[in-house]
Design a protein with these regions (language model features):
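Extracellular low-complexity, Gly/Ser/Thr-rich intrinsically disordered linkers
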Residues: 271, 275, 286, 292-338
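Conserved SGNH/GDSL esterase-like catalytic core that processes O-acyl groups on lipids
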Residues: 65-193
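Short catalytic/ligand-binding loop motif for oxyanion handling, primarily in non-cytosolic enzymes
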Residues: 56-58, 113-116, 158-162, 216-222, ...
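Structural recognition of the beta-strand scaffold that forms the well-ordered cores
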Residues: 46-58, 103-108, 148-153, 158-160, ...
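A short helix->loop->beta-strand "cap" motif at the edges of active sites that frequently abuts
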Residues: 101, 199-206
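Short, solvent-exposed beta-strand-terminating loops
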Residues: 48-64, 212-236
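Substrate-gating cap/lid alpha-helix
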Residues: 219-289, 315
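N-terminal secretory targeting modules
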Residues: 1-103, 332-358
Length: 358
């Protein structure tokens, strides 16, 4: 059974052992034998990422290689990178480690959809052990240690409007786009209410940030450059066309309406957060925020696309997404009291080996 991956700051004992650390008293209790290490770790801030393949380091190639990569790789993305600084991606997790030691929880996975929990997944998603939005929310709800900060970036697979579309909808897509955006909001809202109900009963502060879908308009500028380069040199972007097997709406004929649907979805997300916040007036321990950081990031440079599939992000692409995503975390970090460094920081911060959540 698939479980979220938990990653603890590698040098967390050194960090919280410093007198100026906000967790120094917990460290002293641990050193005196009053608190076991497992309990000490639960007292660190916990940050969870809910999302789809945009939030992972996965890319598509041959079926077996993709299958192995999905099953065995984690991190190496804009949220979590397990390579010690300054190597790899300057991810959100590395930026957070400059402020505090913490526990990162990666729930995101390839192919994830914003779904109705009663829907049955197709065969491909089952063999990839895809966890849709409802499943990822469910994973958080059963955790003994509920996260302090929850980042949500999911829905990119839901804008594949041309997938299984009848010819009539392909020719006149307006009603289909409207229906898909409405259904998306209904399903997203239902899962958010589950999350909010659990967050409200915590005895500590919880911040949730919902990111809009990426800037597909600028993204396709880079994609078109990759397509031209491949037409000139077939050895480049070897699996560029493989994209169409999994994402019909990436075909040039359908892109303009994909961009439209993504904008519609982002409006629904913004309005949903505004509506949910009206019901949180008395919830002083919970902050809910919408961010357009990914929706406005400039993704038009071809080097931001992966050199194999020109679909998912390259290292440079993940760096752009990380910078954008972290920039909008300011209010959440301030709400949680994590906006100032705790203890000394060094350039050698890294993370431990990933472990499965129990």
């Amino acid at each position: 059974m698939w479980k979220p991956v938990r990653v603890v700051s590698a040098n967390f004992l050194e960090r919280i052992g410093e007198p100026e650390s906000r967790f120094h008293s917990d460290y002293l209790a641990y050193r005196n034998g009053d608190v076991p290490q497992a309990e000490l770790i639960t007292r660190l801030p916990h940050v969870a990422m809910i999302g789809d393949s945009v939030c992972t380091g996965v890319y598509v190639s041959s079926p077996w290689s993709t299958f192995w990569r999905v099953r065995n790789c984690c991190g190496n993305s804009w949220f979590l990178d397990t390579n010690p600084a300054p190597l790899g991606i300057r991810s959100v997790s590395k930026r957070l480690e400059e402020l505090t030691a913490f526990v990162a929880i990666e729930c995101a996975g390839i192919g994830a959809l914003v779904d109705h929990e009663s829907e049955r997944q197709n065969f491909l998603r089952r063999i990839l052990r895809t966890r849709n939005f409802s499943g990822q929310i469910g994973d958080l709800l059963v955790m003994k240690r509920f996260p302090d900060l929850i980042l949500i970036s999911i829905g990119h697979n839901n804008v594949d409007w041309a997938w299984r579309s009848p010819t009539s909808d392909l020719e006149q897509p307006e009603s289909r786009l409207q229906r898909q955006s409405r259904d998306f909001r209904k399903n997203f809202t239902r899962q958010m209410r589950r999350l909010i109900d659990r967050a409200r009963v915590q005895r500590y502060r919880v911040a949730v940030i919902v990111y809009g879908l990426i800037n597909f308009e600028s993204y396709f500028i880079g994609r078109e450059i990759a397509e031209r380069l491949r037409s000139q040199d077939p050895s480049r972007y070897l699996h560029l066309e493989t994209t169409y097997k999994y994402f019909t709406s990436f075909r040039p004929a359908y892109r303009s309406n994909l961009i439209r649907l993504a904008r519609m979805v982002n409006k629904e997300l913004r309005d949903m957060v505004r509506e949910l916040n009206r019901g949180l007036a008395g919830a002083t321990n919970l902050q809910l925020q919408y961010s357009d950081a990914l929706a406005t990031a400039d993704l038009s440079r071809v080097e931001l696309l992966h050199p194999i599939d020109a679909w998912h992000a390259s290292v440079q692409g993940h760096n752009v997404l990380a910078e954008a995503a972290f920039r909008d975390l300011g209010p959440s970090l301030e709400f949680l009291g994590l906006n100032r460094p705790s203890g000394k920081t060094t350039a050698a911060h890294g993370v431990t080996r990933p472990t499965q959540m129990g």
